Amino acid sequence: MISREQAREFGLAQRNQLKRAGLQDIPKRRFDPLEVLRAACKDHVPKLLPVKFERMRESPFAFFRGAVEVMAADLGAQRYTRIEVQLCGDAHLKNFGFFATPGSDIVLDINDFDATTRGPWEWDVKRCATSIVLAGRVAGDSNAACKEAARIFLRDYSAWIERFTDMPSLEVARHRALRDYRDPFIRVALKQAERATPLSNLKKLTRRPGRHGYRFISERNLIWEVSGTERKSVLAALPSYRTTLAPDRQMIFDRYRPADVGFKVVGTGSVGTRDYVVLLFGRDLHDPLFLQIKEEPPCAYASYYKDRGAPRNQGQRVVQGQRAMQVFSDLLLGWCSISGRDYLVRQLSDHKSSIEPEELNGGRLAEYSRVCAELLAKGHARSGEPVALASYLGRSGKAVRALLQFAVKYADQTESDYEAFQKALRRGFAKKALKSAGRKANHTPRERSSRPRPSSQLVPEESVPSSETDTAKAAESGS
């Protein structure tokens, strides 16, 4: 624990480590971004990679979402400050959303922490500001409007960091972004969160064949039923997951019993990772619970910044990062391991929804950017030293101007990467990535048909897209 004066001096000293004008710099690359992307996919489920790439090719913003490893490599090659916070790691507009608190209030906050780690504060800010520019361009906003929205985000982030320096630590820890969401577009997302309940998921994701209870609907919303040894391995991990819950949460979990296990395709960046869903019931069939068991690979920033306090289990890393940045976290948030892989466990789509950034046109983009600025600043102030950060930023606007220049230049670079990605797909990039992933992945059931099926076998052969038509349908259905 350092004093306020020590924190102020440390922040000012960081201007020697990285001048504020240097925040705009983007060094010339010494790597091929497509090779970085392909390397990141090597441990993915091979036949789901076409779905991932199909989603990434929708727009430069979608590509940006699916290529966090590329930006991590760019950021890791730059000079950075030593002002450390808990990073979201993948701070873009789509990763802010509504969800229910343990007390059933609906709140808006950062909601994705797959890439969370301790690291330099500016990495989150640069990624989020870039996402604002890209989202605005995809929505049809002018370059001037996109730049202005990013400027508002950066200005408000700095202002909130300054405000947090005058708040008691407990007040910072409890801070909630309170808004009267009058915009019809945002209110639609809020209403969706209110309607997304376990009972609504039961109707949407499952069927009830006769007297055999509820089962996941195969292929609908890209969920497939899991059976055999694979199912047993997933269920066998639940007792270990239970130990990661607080005693009062364990009592809640103990009221439920598993009924079915499925495999789900999720998101854009996460497509290809292993993701299970478990349906459980409490006292009767009107008391369902859906758990998502989501594979967590090593952090995208691990090669560029050493988080000395990071736990070995990647699911635990995500849980700890989420709790550090959020005021409220999922009631049943925990972690486990299955067949040597680490997983995050949480409720599936319980009162959750998010804004579609591509539709944030006009004044909506700027207004939503203000909310995101407050939420990101809150997460950084909770987990870092706001006095040091405010001292570094100052009040002259130098840091804001430099970061704005970075956001515009990096958005331009992302669009160039997107064009290169499109060309690479036409030249067989997907096949090369599939081949690389196939060398590292387990054999398919067909290849192992004469041997006992191992617990690490993840997706039945018939469950994954096997043709361009199937892939297109999968991509259109979303997550």
Tell me the role of every PLM-derived stretch.
Residues 448-479:
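Long, low-complexity, intrinsically disordered segments
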